[in-house]
Structure formats: C-alpha cells, structure tokens
Amino acid sequence: MTVEETLAELVSIDSVSKRSNAEIIKYLAARTEALGWRAKTFPYRDERGIEKVNMIAVAGTDAEKIEVELALVGHTDTVPFDAAWTDALRLTERDEKLYGRGACDTKGFIAAALTAIERIDLRKLRRPLALVFTADEEVGCLGAKELADAHALSARYSIVGEPTSLQPMRAGKGYCLAEIILRGREGHSAYPALGASAIFRAARLVRRIEIIAEELKAEQLAAFEPPYTTLNVGIIQGGTAKNIIAGECRFTLEWRPLPGQAAAYLLDLIRAAIEDEKSRDADFDCSLEVIRLDNGMETAKDSALVRLLEEVTAREAGTISFGTEAPQMAEMGAEAVVFGPGNIRVAHRTNEFVPLEELRECVEILSRAIERFCL
C-alpha cells in the first residue's frame, strides 16, 4: 500500500478530539499486527466519560516492560472541521498537495511511519522499535501524559510527528494555562460605595501581569522566535449587566516558557503580585487554578538523532514555539526531536494539506532513522 493510500484511509476515519479514537486505534492495531508487531493498548476515559485509547506497537522485544531504542510518535486526534468542508474526510489531491482533515496534523506522519515499517525485516532488528499512537493531543497532550504517568514506555530516542516542513526541531517552548477568578460585591452602579468591582480588581492584576510579561523579555534564547517566554491574557469575562457593579471577573492566562525555565516560575511571580494586591486591599478576593503546566524541552545539538536528521534533510535543527508531545517523551527518557511533513501554518484550517513530495520524502527519512538506530 502506498503512503498516499494509507493516508486516505486514516483521513477517512473521523477522529476529532471530542469523539472516541477507538476506531482509528483499531485500524492501526490491525495494520501493525499484520506485520508481526505486538500492539498494546492503554484505554482511559476523558473528563466527559468518552473512551480514549493510546497504543504502543513494538517490534524487536517480547518483554512486558517496553524499552526501545527508537519511538515514532503520532497523535491520532484532529481538531474539528467546518461542515461546509464536505471533503474533510476524503483525501483529495490538487497540484501535488493532499487535502483532508489531519493530512498535515498529524496523520501524514502516521502514514509515513506505517509505510516505513512495512520495509523492515523484523528478523534483522538489533534494537527494539516502537510506534506510539496517542489520543487527545489537540486538547492538552492528555494521552501522552497518561502514558508518561503510567511509565508505559522507555525510549532512548523519539521522533515526535508534527508538521515542521521536514525540518528537525530539537527544542520547544512549554505550554501552560491558568484561570484566575476575582470576586467583588455586586451593587447598583449609581452607588459605587455599596459594592466592589471585580472587574476593576481584575484590571489592576492584568496590568501587573502585563509588566511581568515585559520583564520576562530579559531572559532570551536567540534560537526561538520570539526569543523569550511569552505571556497572554486570552479570555476575560465579568459582570452581568451594564448597571450592576461586577461581582465576579475571570480571565485565562497562557504562557510558553523557554526550555530550562520552570513552567511554575511564572506562577510564583503571579502569586506574588496577588499577595501584594491583598496587602493593599484587605478585601481583594482572588483564586488561581492551574489547568496545564508543561515544561519546555531541549535535546542537545550533538544528539545522535539530531545529527542524523540534520544529515538526511540537509537542514539545521531548529526550534518551535507551539505545544507538542515531546516533553512527555522526554519524561519517558527520550532524546526527542519534533519532525514531520506539512507546515504548521496550514494545520487546523479548512483545506488543510500536506505536500505529496514531503510525505514521500518523510517515508525515506524515517526509514533511514530506523536503519541507523534499530537495524
């Protein structure tokens, strides 16, 4: 089966994050088991009670504890698609580009990995190899976190599939989210002294957060764009009517820490700002809930995996600022590199696509990596 045919079958399976991914995992298990691989599933239920499944397919070892030389990692879920995109689940080719939901992010990589392993004579494997297929990457890398928490896998090297236009990415920023809630006291807006505005309190805190965001620019890594930890207040909600003093205001805080900077570092700065506001206003009522706290990752320039991918692509390893499952693979012991066909800038949009030439080239590159580390 060609890589294009495999991608067409993967795209035809609706695996939007809000649904169970059991169907696509069943397909992947059948494909790998037919080649003599051992497929082990790790089911769990998300916060809505929907069944999700991670899977690790292993070759070269029968040990119960999965320890491998190289792991190829791809997430099976996709973002939703607009109903007007009627061909979202049917792979279509135009101008040497393959269109379909997930074609770029990240079913193209999965198709390339499946095609690459079909070339392997398992009898010649000298070191174990794994394919790792995860759920819920698009909603917080939850599947990969399940695997890391369960110590389901140990790997020396890992290629984490994401659309990087076939440029190896050896370092990435972390991704963190928190919700901050401020409470005041409702009252008629004509009589401000009778209430306390939660929105005014939020505004004071947001201003302090803006100052912190500027201060974070002092610590920089030139390889990143932008080269500092970014901080954003993306959502803010408060009040119930124009003539009522707001009793509550909440906002979402997002930050992307540089590798080497603890994800919790910024939390300490925010909490210090909150405590300072409380010292100035005894009624300052504020709570902070951490939603996601993922550290950045960095694999050394002289890593054998980095050097190999630089050699076969003739491109210097770079860095990324978007979230991936590389930090979870690093937790499981791997020197991780993010890599795959397609461009992140066309992911998540209607008419997402992967260039056919890149898809085919990815098969060759993954084959080279398998040959280098496992054969």
Which residue stretches match the model-derived regions?
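Alpha-helical metal-binding/catalytic segments enriched in His/Glu/Asp
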Residues: 72, 92-138, 179-182, 193-213, ...
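Short beta-strand segments
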Residues: 73-74, 132-134, 158-162, 181-183, ...
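Acidic/His- and Gly-rich active-site-bordering loop/insert found
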Residues: 1-98, 122-125, 343
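Acidic-glycine-rich active-site phosphate/pyrophosphate-binding loop
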Residues: 79-94, 155, 170-181
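Acidic, glycine-rich active-site loops and adjacent beta-strand->loop/helix elements
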Residues: 76, 97, 132-139, 163-166, ...
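Residue-level signal for inorganic ion chemistry
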Residues: 10, 14, 162, 202, ...
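Metal-dependent amide/peptide-bond hydrolase catalytic core
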Residues: 170, 177-375
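Acidic/histidine-rich catalytic neighborhood of metal-dependent amide-processing enzymes
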Residues: 106-177, 374
